[in-house]
Amino acid sequence: SASGMWVGFENLEPTIQGNSETGHQQIGNNSLASQLPLEITNSIDSGSFFENSALNTVISNAKERSTKINFCFLLSGVRGNDGRVHSAWNHLEAFLELVFERYKLPVKQVQMQAILDGRDSGIHSSITKEQGSGDFLGRLQNLLGIYDANESLAWVIGRSTAMDRDYRESAAKTDFDLLTGKAMHTVSSFDEVREIISESHSNGRTDQDISPISLTRTDGTKPVLSKGDAFINLNFRSDRQRSKIGFLAGARSLLKSESESRGRTWDGSWIEHNLNLDICTIAEYHPDFETKYKVTVAFPTK
């Protein structure tokens, strides 16, 4: 069966569905080859995740320098059938434990970009329960609440903008503007985020197309990605992460070549931002990020 543990995924119910690629990876092997999500999960179970050199270096540097840790995560992947294509919920749980329990970072030093799915999970599953899953925003609120860290939710955005694989400059620029504090729809609570999402659903817009939302803290400050900050991407599938990491790392030449290969032309002047971010990705997205742009990878391709 080209699914679940037989193609190197976690043994979950419902079973995670594989494809021809994951099936072909097992041909000729004497033992099952683990897919990256399982490798990460195994590291969490063994405890080695919390000792991961790349993650710990970025987090400890931010703690020492008193710079912010910004991170993004696609809200999906609790079960085997509600996403888990780009992200896995237990990876988010482990990361928050690392940041808030192991490093005891203050909430004001952590800023999360929550990306809404609506494609690999239900189209309204950010706020709607579906077949034992869904309500990802509620799950996130409960999870952050464990650490009294609800104010670390800084930005909410649909995946069609924040995880665009077609190299649309307008999508990348919108995502960048959200992270850097440009004018966006601003609210101050989870409930207000729900109201905006619910209204969007009523108007025919699904989770993946939700417009950018910025959440202010109780003191009125607006979340901003600042020069010298850390940025960690917790999504493990590479194709929809390259554009974001490209513009954050200032990889203008890479984005130019990738967009041109798809018949698009970027202006790209806004990428000359000199943010000098300390970037770590959970998986390897493009070899140039490491060799040319000082991006570190927590779980490199083997």
Over which residues does each language-model region extend?
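N-terminal and secondary-structure boundary signal
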Residues: 163-164
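Hard-cation-handling environments
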Residues: 145-147, 154-156, 167-302
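Active-site nucleophile/metal-coordination loop of metallo-enzymes that catalyze phosphate/sulfate
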Residues: 1-80, 84-160, 170, 261-302
